[in-house]
Amino acid sequence: MAQSAERPRPYAFMTANATRPVRTRFAPSPTGFLHLGGARTALFSWAFARHHQGVFVLRIEDTDVERSTPEAVQAILDSMDWLGMQPDEGPFYQMKRMDRYAEVLAGMLEAGTAYHCYCSPEEVDAMREAARAKGLKPRYDGTWRPEPGKTLPPVPADRKPVIRFRNPIDGATSWNDMVKGPISFDNGELDDLIIARPDGTPTYNFCVVVDDWDMGITHVLRGDDHVNNTPRQINILRALGATLPEYGHVPMILGPDGEKLSKRHGAVNVMEYDAQGYLPEAMINYLARLGWSHGDDELFTREQLVEWFDTRHLSKSASQWDPKKLNWVNAHYIKGMDDAELAGRVAPRVERRGGKPQAADLPAIMGLLKDRAETLEQLAEDAMLFCGEYQPAPAELAAQHLTETARAALADFAARARDTEWNRAAISALIKAVLADRGLKMPQLGIPLRVAVTGRAQTPAVDAVLELLGKETVLARLQAL
């Protein structure tokens, strides 16, 4: 395989498919949850389709019956929905297309572009070992491949055949990859691929080809672990007389340590990020920047991503997952969100903690807390100060801060507060008056106020906290000292 150092511009696909409406697809296998790499691939395919006013297709490749589960399918659909990447068509399920695959297989057998092979797995293994011993690439030797003047072995009576694709022997299969540039494989290096198993079920590479053909897919963006599949799929499409899609292969995502991203680096399941309190807007932004760029722009809306998306700006190099950068992006979106909308997203998380968001002014609470929060979970936890059941300060904390001097100042504050208008400015003025009259510094009243009213020594600005708790609650807690 050879790759060029430079990508030609303009790309071949910009003219080759100029008259074909853009149709992209995302085709996950439901053998597990949608992981970050898959989500990024889906995002690039979705953004490309949206940029070109095209169609984004969702296809579920569920032919691995033993490993595919309904739960995994639902998790994929939930993840796509959460990220706001709803397909224009689909989801389509490969298991519901078996009759179509059988029809195409029969046509290929009749046309001579596929053939039955009766070699046992052990015989094929022996062929490959023999090739290795000669220093050759291990491959099937074409024993059952029909050729003019060739006599095929007798058909074993007790063995069901596989179906192999009759791959071209001469020449090369080349394409101008949308990400990597020109790529070429010698056809002589490619096996006659098995496209149906002995029980008749079609294999992955065959199903993909038929699906892309039937669904009119014009552009395939996928992980670069599929590069070796591409020449095989191109040759099958050519044998079917199909118009080829354009292919682009994006590099993998690496963990912070430079190794392949895995569970040991933290969450890899997309919906775990929802549970941890990340906004889908932030995930879209961050995932897009993992392998794609628009100048120096780090932050952009979904609409800007669609407007700016260009495969020429996809990186050829692997990207590195950075949890701190994700937190920074998420914090940006939290700070910029309307308080009422943010409250709506945080309220269910408060309720799961046993809090009562409806009993407090949650939008105002969000306005107070959001500038220091990185996740919705952090916001929900901090909001429990206002929405949760009051827990008096631990004895040790109370003994440290609720001294006789502090209690006298708190009693003075409470007495004056009864006739004070309850807003942040008035509360701030009241605190300053008590400090001035008693010759105290801010920590000598501010910390005791926090401890007495919230049970904590550290909170956001004390005047803002007291305002949101309400005069009745504040006075009741001070009275209980």
Curated annotation (Swiss-Prot):
Annotated protein name in UniProt: Glutamate--tRNA ligase
Entry keywords, A to Z: Aminoacyl-tRNA synthetase, ATP-binding, Cytoplasm, Ligase, Nucleotide-binding, Protein biosynthesis
This enzyme's EC code(s): 6.1.1.17
Disulfide partners: none
Family statement: Belongs to the class-I aminoacyl-tRNA synthetase family. Glutamate--tRNA ligase type 1 subfamily.
PANTHER family: GLUTAMATE--TRNA LIGASE, GLUTAMATE--TRNA LIGASE, MITOCHONDRIAL-RELATED
Gene transcribed to yield this protein: gltX
Quaternary structure note: Monomer.
Subcellular location: Cytoplasm
Record motif 'KMSKS' region, residues: 260-264
Entry-linked NCBIfam families: gltX_bact
Functional description taken from the UniProt entry: Catalyzes the attachment of glutamate to tRNA(Glu) in a two-step reaction: glutamate is first activated by ATP to form Glu-AMP and then transferred to the acceptor end of tRNA(Glu).
Biased composition (Basic and acidic residues): 139-148
Enzyme class, first EC level, given as a word: ligase
Binding site for ATP: K263
Molecular function GO labels: ATP binding; glutamate-tRNA ligase activity; tRNA binding; zinc ion binding
Coiled coil: none
Disordered as annotated region, ranges: 139-159
GO CC, any one term: cytosol
Pfam families to which the protein is assigned, alphabetical: Anticodon_2, tRNA-synt_1c
Chain location of the short sequence motif 'HIGH' region per the record: 28-38
Catalytic activity: tRNA(Glu) + L-glutamate + ATP = L-glutamyl-tRNA(Glu) + AMP + diphosphate
